[in-house]
Amino acid sequence: MTKAVLTSISQLALKALLYEVSLSPKPGLVDRFDNGAHDDMSFMTFIDSMIALSPFFQAYIETGFAYAKEEPLLLFNRLRQLGQKAEETMFCATQGINTHKGLNFSMALLLGATGAYLARTPHLMTDLGRFSKEDTLAICRLVKPMTAHLIQTDLGHLNTKKEFTYGEQLFVTYGIKGPRGEASEGFTTLTDHALPYFRQMISQNDPETSQLRLLVYLMSIVEDGNLIHRGGIEAWKGVKADMRLLLQQDLSTTDLRLALSSYNQCLINQHLSPGGAADLLALTFYFAFLEKLL
């Protein structure tokens, strides 16, 4: 019974990734229609990556459930070790292409936290109905003590390094903390912005329109390291401003699709991809499935 419940929830994480890549059109991002601003990956690359990561999603939630009483830092270390194995498996499946590195990190923590939360709330295990928004908030808050040390330990001593990873370079150059920062704050972009917005949208619109509007909203607010890495601070600010204007127009679904298709070409021409917004889109979908919003 327990394993079946944990398996079903881990499959929601996979489903969230499938929904994210399938949502179309997504400016600058890989979707069903084209590869966006990416010349090294396609829709099929994402499928390969998701299949490789799927067994680890189950391992994350089972680890959180099994070690729910452990000190948060010890649980984090277990999840990170699993996450590193998952990352290696992903790169093997994609021939070295980074499809889901940051998202895998976030999913490891949130699935681990989901498992730990379920261990502490057994009624959700016996009657797996809709998670409340309070359940979602509690899960995200469990991540905070697991990752309170992360910025200092991972990014606090970079002055001694000569070569940086992509995330480290963003921190050194711009102070962008990326997924580490989001996790260490308890995923407040999710709990305070993305999910409240999506709950409102889904109560007023059909699912696809709500998802497209959520993407635009995220692109208008997210500190997007991918955009900044590719185009610098001004390019990122420009995309945010463009998306704020698009939101204000309150377009019909048909017109919104046309606007996003047009903006896709604009971002392709500038080689810009809002990968940070895409990751948070997938994480929002995960909790939307738990809450049965979708």
Curated annotation (Swiss-Prot):
One example GO MF annotation: triphosphoribosyl-dephospho-CoA synthase activity
Protein name in UniProt: Probable 2-(5''-triphosphoribosyl)-3'-dephosphocoenzyme-A synthase
The protein's enzyme class: transferase
GO BP terms, alphabetized: prosthetic group biosynthetic process
Reactions the enzyme catalyzes: 3'-dephospho-CoA + ATP = 2'-(5''-triphospho-alpha-D-ribosyl)-3'-dephospho-CoA + adenine
Gene3D superfamilies: Triphosphoribosyl-dephospho-CoA protein (1.10.4200.10)
Keywords noted in UniProt: ATP-binding, Nucleotide-binding, Transferase
InterPro entries in UniProt: CitG, TriPribosyl-deP-CoA_syn_CitG
Gene for this chain: citG
Keyword check for Transferase: yes
Keyword tRNA processing: no
Family the entry assigns: Belongs to the CitG/MdcB family.
EC nos: 2.4.2.52
